[in-house]
């Protein structure tokens, strides 16, 4: 069975450091080998939120799925694929309608059974919940930074902007 691996990190720091991407890649490649899956390609989105579907590698993966270039999408955890339940369900439906399966290497669910679908949806709900909690924790710090005159949104203010 031909498999596409999808890995993602949310922040530029994680993308530059590479640790999380490296861990995901190595784990998924070892998992695929252990269960006898042939890797078609690794799709990687660096420093892009899982709350958005506007991700270059994700779009390419979906295009290749429609072209039937692989049989299965393999992720480390479903929150690497999406942290928005509605988007997650739509993305997986899009894969399934193209004849492509979806599997997490670390979470046990089987979307061909009613119990498996329930577990999958619960895990998707937890991913969205965690994303919302992260936003709740980060927002007050960002407000405080603005009040102190610090630039928010990137490491440095855009060229020519003084803060």
Regions found by a protein language model. Give the residues of each.
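Short, structured surface patches at the beginning of a domain
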Residues: 1-144
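Coupling/hinge elements of helicase-like and P-loop NTPase modules
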Residues: 132-163
């Amino acid at each position: 069975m031909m498999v596409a691996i999808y890995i993602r990190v949310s922040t530029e720091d994680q993308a530059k450091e590479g640790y999380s991407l490296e861990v995901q890649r190595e784990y998924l490649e070892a998992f695929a080998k252990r269960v006898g899956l042939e890797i078609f390609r690794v799709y990687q989105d660096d420093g892009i939120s899982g709350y958005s579907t506007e991700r270059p590698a994700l779009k390419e993966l979906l295009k290749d799925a429609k072209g039937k270039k692989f049989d299965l999408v393999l992720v480390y955890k479903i929150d690497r694929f999406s942290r928005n339940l509605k988007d997650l369900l739509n993305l997986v439906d899009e894969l399934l309608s193209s004849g492509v399966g979806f599997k997490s290497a670390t979470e046990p669910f089987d979307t061909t059974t009613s119990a498996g679908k329930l577990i999958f949806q619960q895990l998707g709900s937890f991913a969205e919940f965690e994303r919302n909690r992260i936003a709740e924790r980060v927002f007050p710090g960002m407000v405080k930074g603005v009040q102190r005159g610090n630039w928010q949104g990137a490491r440095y203010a855009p060229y020519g902007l003084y803060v």
